Each structure stands twice: as C-alpha cells, then as structure tokens.
Design a protein with these regions (language model features):
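Glycan-association/targeting regions that enable binding to alpha-glucans and other polysaccharides
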Residues: 1-112
Length: 112
C-alpha cells in the first residue's frame, strides 16, 4: 500500500536561457526566501566552470524591488567547456548558499 503525497520544493535558482551559450548573455535569478541569505542586503554570484576547476568571476547581484529576487547577468566565457558552476554568498556577513555543498550547475549549449 502506498500513500500518495505531493511535495512542493522551493526553487531557489532559475537560469535564462536554460542552456547558456558561450560568448552570449546569461541571467541567473536567485530567490533567497527561506534560505541562508534571506536576510542579506547584498548577494554575490560566485561563478566557476566545469566543477569549479576555475573561478571565472564574482558578479554582484541586483535585487528586484517588486519580487525580492536577486538577478545577475554576465557573458558566458568562451573558455567554458561543459557547464557553469555557481553558488551565492553575502560578502558582508560571510554566509554562503551552496546547495548543501553541491553548488548549482547549468549545462552550456552544445555547438553543432
């Protein structure tokens, strides 16, 4: 006998486009509600590539006054091979949100 239960997990991150392309613009949105950076006044996107083998950049995020969500837009470096790896931090309080030490990843668009 199985019980039917539905669970709604909070979605902290959205990547646009879903498969970012090298040399093109990418926007990462972060919803801090319910997470460790919920009370942060400043959030930075910590961005690397391919398992964080290399740190690409730290990108200051802007907070949308209406939704309260954070947003950062950047150009995907041509040197990115397989995926972007990223997490978020509050530089003023030294607090990180790294998805339980798993970070987040976005697959880079394939070039055919």
């Amino acid at each position: 006998v199985f019980d039917r239960a539905e669970y709604a997990a909070h979605r902290f991150v959205r990547v646009e486009p879903a498969f970012p392309a090298r040399g093109e613009s990418c926007t990462i949105r972060y919803d801090a509600q319910g997470g460790p950076l919920e009370a942060s006044g400043r959030v930075v996107l910590h961005l690397g590539r391919d398992e964080f083998n290399d740190l690409l950049m730290d990108v200051p995020m802007e907070r949308d006054a209406e939704s309260g969500r954070w947003r950062a837009t950047f150009v995907v470096p041509d040197s990115t091979k397989w995926h972007l790896a990223f997490c978020f931090f509050d530089p003023e309080r030294g607090i990180w949100h790294n998805n339980h030490a798993q970070n987040w990843q976005a697959l880079v668009a394939r070039e055919w």
